[in-house]
Amino acid sequence: MIYDFEKNIPEVHSEAWVAANATIIGKVKLEKNSSIWFNATLRGDIENIYVGEGSNIQDGSVLHTDPGYTLKIGKNVTVGHLVMLHGCTIGDNSLIGIGAVILNNAKIGKNCIIGAKALITENKEIPDNSLVIGAPGKVIRQVTEEEVKSITENAIHYQNNWKKYSESIF
């Protein structure tokens, strides 16, 4: 469902996809080829939420903000199942693993992998090309060229997959 909130109407690109039971509220902008999967919630009732071109927000994820903390997701980002993003910035071509939590004013660089169940605390900055695991999250190494390629391939998979869903079930 897509809801306006206090006269703020979500902007959904004509070539983006929102699952029927996902919830998009208020100050949310979805760019071309982005996809919002089942039971995900993007609650733009306080600050802006921006989802970049080709990015996917997978099932059960929650995106929200606090006053003064917008949420920005770059291009070709994969946000895995059950992720919590709160007032943070995610760089292009990054992958946020299943169940990860990223808090206010955290900044994730480009081409990063944030491991499943990782916790990125407030104000933490993760450099480009980092692999992060743990709670609290720690950079354990740089990602390989093969891993960067895999992140891109995963985003492309979801760009193709939402089109199949839009043709098959709606």
Descriptions of predicted regions:
Residues 157-170:
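Charged phosphate-binding loop/patch that engages nucleotide di/tri-phosphates or the phosphate backbone
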Residues 5-6, 10-127, 131-132, 137-139:
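Structural signal for interior beta-strand "rungs" in well-ordered beta-sheet cores
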Residues 143-146:
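Strongly charged
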